Each structure stands twice: as C-alpha cells, then as structure tokens.
Amino acid sequence: MSDRYELFLTCPKGLEGLLAEEATALGLQETREHTSAIRGSADMETAYRLCLWSRLANRVLLVLKRFPMKDAEDLYHGVLDVEWHDHLEPEGTIAVEFSGHGSGIDNTHFGALKVKDAIVDKLRTPEGERPSVDKINPDLRVHLRLDRGEAILSLDLSGHSLHQRGYRLQQGAAPLKENLAAAILIRAGWPRIAAEGGALADPMCGVGTFLVEAGMIAADIAPNIKRERWGFSAWLGHVPTLWRKLHDEALARAEAGLAKTPSWIRGYEADPRLIQPGRNNIERAGLSDWIKVYQGEVATFEPRPDQNQKGLVICNPPYGERLGDEASLLYLYQNLGERLRQACLNWEAAVFTGAPDLGKRMGIRSHKQYSFWNGALPCKLLLIKVTPDQFVTGERRTPEQRQVERENPVEVEVVERKLNKNGNPIKPEPVVVEQARLSEGGQMFANRLQKNLKLLGKWVRREGIDCYRVYDADMPEYSLAIDLYHDWVHVQEYAAPKSIDPEKASARLFDALAAIPQALNIDKSRVVIKRRERQSGTKQYERQSAQGQFLEVSEGGVKLLVNLTDYLDTGLFLDHRPMRMRIQREAAGKRFLNLYAYTATASVHAAKGGARSTTSVDLSRTYLDWARRNLSLNGFSDKNRLEQGDVMAWLQANRDEYDLIFIDPPTFSNSKRMEGIFDVQRDQVELIDLAMARLAPGGVLYFSNNFRKFVLDENLGQRYAVEDITAQTIDPDFARNGKIHRAWKITARA
C-alpha cells in the first residue's frame, strides 16, 4: 500500500471552510472543499491525527479506489477487484454505507447489498468462512459514494461519527451536535480569548455542550481522546505503534492543559431538570474543576469572573418552530440584549440563532455574521462587541430624548408581596428598568394602541367590561387583532398574502410585539400570539397547544373561563357580547336553545337572566365539558342541559319547543361524528326551517354567522318575519370592522 492516501472528511453543511483550515493545520495537504466535505492527501500519521484532533469533522474516510460505473455489474466488479485480504480477516464483520444514485442504482439499500456481496465473495474461504454484517460495531465500515458516474470506495477510519465525543449521554430537547458547537466557538474567537485568559459564560447552557467544547479547547484536550473503538481498530492496515505514539502525545498535552490555572467557564440554565444532566456531562468530560453550572434565568444573568476578566458570552437561544412562540421568544431575545448591555459591557458575544430577525431585537448590532446549518435548518451566528457604540437606541429617539430617559428611568412595581414582622404587606421598592426601544414603525403602532385605549376607555369603564378588542388591523401593515382579557393580551396575526415579503411581515410582527407591553401597560409574559388563516373542516377547533391554563373573566355579571393558549379561539367570541347581553335581558322564564353552542357562554347569560331552562347542543365533547365548567362556575344546576351531537340531526330528532333560540353556526364543518358536510351558505334554509319548527308560538330565533360573503336566502324573508339587527349587535370595540358578523331576528309571521 502507498505511503500517502486520499482522504475525505465529512462535516455539517457550512463548516467546510473551517474544517479545511483545521485539517490543513493538522497536516492534510492539497486540501479542496466540497459540499459538506473536504478532501486532501495525507500519510497515516496525519490520518490518525485527524481522527484524534478534529473538532469539526464527522468522519475521516480513506479512499481505496475510484472507478467509472455504468451499472450494477460495474459496481460489483469494481469492488471485487480490491484486495480485501489486505483490509479484513475472512471471519471479520462489515457494515456498508452507500450514498448517491444513478448508473442503474436508484436504491441505496440495493447499492449497499452489491458492495457487501462483492466483499463477501472476495473473502469467502474454501471452508465457507466469510464476513458477516454488523451494522453497530463492525470491524470494517465501508463507504461507497456514487457521484456523476464515478464510484468512490472508502474505509471509514472514524467508526462512529466523530461528533460523538462520549461525554454527552444526557441531552436536552434541542441539542447542538458537538462539532457544530465547536465550530461556533472557533468562529466566535474562543481559542484566542482563552489563550488570553478570558472567561466564557452561556446564559442558556442546556446540558452544557458549549461549555464542554470550550473547556476542551482551553485545556488543549483532543476531542476524541476518550474514544475506545475506532473504524481502524480491526483494520489490517492499522499501525498500532504509530497510533499509541499519537495518543500518548495527546494524553500528555491534556495533562499539561488541565494542570494550568482553569479558565473561568460558567453556564446558567432556567430549567432545573437540565442542571444535573449538564453537570454529569461535564464530569464525564473530566472538566468539573473548570466548568460550573447554576440554575438561573436570562433576566438575572450577570457573569462575575474571579479576576474580573472579560470574555465571551455564547448561547443558542430557542428559535420558535411552534405556532405562537413568537411573543415569548421576542421577549427572551430582548431580555438577552438588556442583560448584555447592563451586565456584560466590553465583553464579546456570540448568538447562534435560526431566527435572525429575533437576533435584531437584542438592541445591539452584530459586527460579523456567519451562515451555518443546524441539521436542515439554516442558521446565523451573530458576533457582537458589547460596547455602547454598538447599542441600537431606536430610530425615533433624538439625543435630547435619550438624555431625558437616562435622567428619568421608568419605574415598575414588583408584583411579589412581602410581609413585615407584624404580617402586614411591605410596599416594595420600585425596580428601575430600561426603556423599551421601539423602531419608528413600532412607535407608530404603540401610538395607535394608546389612542384606541383612550377612545374606548370611557365606554369600557361605564359598561364594566373585562374583555374587549383594542386593535383590529387598523394599520394595514400591522395585520393583527389584539384583545384584552383583563390583564392578559391575546394577539392574532392574520396570515399575510403571498404578495407580501415574509421577512418584512416578520419584522413588522416583531415591531408590534415589542410595542404591545409598553403601549398597553401589560407584562410581556402575559402576551399570547396566534396566527389566523383560512381553516378547513374542523381545523379551526383543533388544539394548538396543551397548557390547559384557564383564566376567569367577567361579562354582564357572569363569570366565564377562557383559554388563551391551547386553541385558535379562546372560548369567548368577543364580537357576540351584545347578543349575549340581549339574550340575558330576554331570557326570563323562557326555554332557551343554543345551537352550535361552543362553550355555551350564551347559555350562561340566559341562565343568569332567569331562563326556565337552557339546552346547549354542540358536536365537541371538549367544548361541552368547558360549557359545564362555565355553568358550574356560576352556580347553575342540571336544568341546563348539554347535548352532544350534530345540530342538523339533533333538530330532526327533537320534538321539544323553545321560546328563545340562538344559532351561531360555523362557516363550514365536517367531522367523523356528523352526517355529511355543513356549509352555512348552502344549508341555511334547512337549518333555520328545522329550528323554526322547534320555536314556540311568540318565540324569537336569533341567527348569526361570521362568513363575510354570506347572503341570507330571500325565501326565508317570504316564509318568516326577518329583521337584520347587525348594527345593534356591534359594540364600539368592533365598530372598526362592521363585517365581523351578521345577525338577524327571525319570528313566525303573524
């Protein structure tokens, strides 16, 4: 075999340049970059050194042969021609990995089988001995890559992927791979900072991957020094004496590195469940004397190194893949920016994020940005110098305004109540907090919210209303519906049309989310965001989350439960407030029927108004259970019936009479539990006819729906006395959107 080999080193996408620099420094020559890989030439000593010392590679592949390939037979014979007796004993074990397609190979499993068959046929002895397959820990791992008609056959010297260092046996929900974490540290300048005696802190450390990788860099520990089994361990071309020499050198360097004064490396994690797993990982890496982990929130993050040295703050905040994460993540990034400005002046910072728009909300400019991939997710590494000249102070604030803000900081009262020795509350000292920084658009949006609050204030106070809409896409570029539920804010983002640039829409959303707590004087932890878009079938009623948190609100003397987090709607349609109040006024002594009852809020109002009985019909058991809680919350008994069923089928089977009926159907609905599909425009006549058949003499039916294109069938006007009462059912908070719903009063003709 030759003294020099062609090597392929694979890596995560985006790390190719860094890996090329690292591999060249370790001795690789003629280095060239490819997508998610580099290649070059090296002797065996360099190949071993790359396996031991590469912090960035996934695998080190030693190329055995390249050959042209037109079909499966070319593949088989190309592999068969290799002298496999130089690489593996006949009774050894193999695993084959195949990548690429073409040349008659469209199935990687088939390609791997052809490679395996060729190796087995070559090594089969007259006595019948032959290699067997071991996919977990084979003696030899063979890789074949098919690239534009060329087959590249390699041995995998690394065995398991090199990112698996052996210390991280416990991990959190969204861990970074170790080699990606190392790449981020290198890009952030940690090797330089560590050499200068600088500190490192991670305010969201999870199970400590950044911390351990940083410790190994600072202590000059080879990342794979503790690996016991390699892809070359049973390879017949392995040179054990050379390997032991390099491994002993690495052990000596690690011993010398750990004997130095430890770098100050600290991690902080809000989730108490991750603290011990993080400490266990650090202990397995042998770095317990160097790295400490504590429980702590971002809001209280303040690194205090022993020698007061500066250093690097590094973190991988959540990105927000779930619907509704935007608000909480925006405030997390804002908090991170505030802590950097207040507690880390003159430090360097590195923020790795899959949501660069959120990174812009920290209020500090990044001086460099690098593109990475975390699996299939494109990400950015934002490098920041935490100095005042990099602080973003808001577009609309003049130097004079900033001076006023410095001299007159905002004060907020602490919610927590403390008692003196006599058991009486102690008024807490106000906490000085930094003024929120809004963009020009964000400030305009905040001004509109405050204007709306002022306009609605007198009406809200007079009516004693607890929940109301304060904004409904008043400014087209901020397409949101914002509702106040006592001291909570429910934000619904209307899905932007395809013609709108998604990045601009995202930036405006973040502007709005930054403005809402300040404009409405609401704690940012009490802002919930959802996205509204055209729903099909039962999707509009599907669960969005599973927090199960209910908030008690009041309306017209009744108490109602709302859930702001788990479903698209909250359990209370605010636009129907006037209709519910009308029902309460008219219900005394009457038998009330509520069709498509949802959470039966109208039934609660009817019961409050003195209804003789209420019957609520809905297809959803979940919402009927919610309705039962609403009724129980107000002390109403079993005279208030809850019926689960398809409304149309229920009406056809029912023979009772009712004095007051309310119908608020969905625009469209289908379910496994209902017969057919309901379409309000198509099925309105049948629905109203069935309901009117159950209306007692002198009774009233109220019909409403939210379908903006709905047209009431003119035949209904000929059959019954029909009055459009829409204008009477729109309160001031929905006056900006007169098409929020339509409503009619229907009675029998005299």
From Swiss-Prot:
Cross-referenced CDD domains: AdoMet_MTases, THUMP_AdoMetMT
A GO term from the CC aspect: cytoplasm
Localisation: Cytoplasm
Molecular function GO terms recorded: 23S rRNA (guanine(2445)-N(2))-methyltransferase activity; RNA binding; rRNA (guanine-N7-)-methyltransferase activity
Gene3D superfamilies (alphabetical): 3.30.2130.30, RNA methyltransferase domain (HRMD) like (3.30.750.80), Vaccinia Virus protein VP39 (3.40.50.150)
EC number(s) recorded for this UniProt protein: 2.1.1.173, 2.1.1.264
Entry-linked InterPro entries: 23SrRNA_methyltr_KL (IPR017244), DNA_methylase_N6_adenine_CS (IPR002052), RlmKL-like_Mtase (IPR000241), RlmL_1st (IPR054170), SAM-dep_methyl-trfase (IPR019614), SAM-dependent_MTases_sf (IPR029063), THUMP_dom (IPR004114)
Spans through the membrane: none
Keyword set, alphabetical order: Cytoplasm, Methyltransferase, RNA-binding, rRNA processing, S-adenosyl-L-methionine, Transferase
The THUMP domain, residue ranges: 46-157
NCBIfam families linked: PRK11783.1
The family this protein is said to belong to: Belongs to the methyltransferase superfamily. RlmKL family.
Functional summary from the UniProt entry: Specifically methylates the guanine in position 2445 (m2G2445) and the guanine in position 2069 (m7G2069) of 23S rRNA.
Record-linked HAMAP family: 23SrRNA_methyltr_KL (MF_01858)
Protein name per the record: Ribosomal RNA large subunit methyltransferase K/L
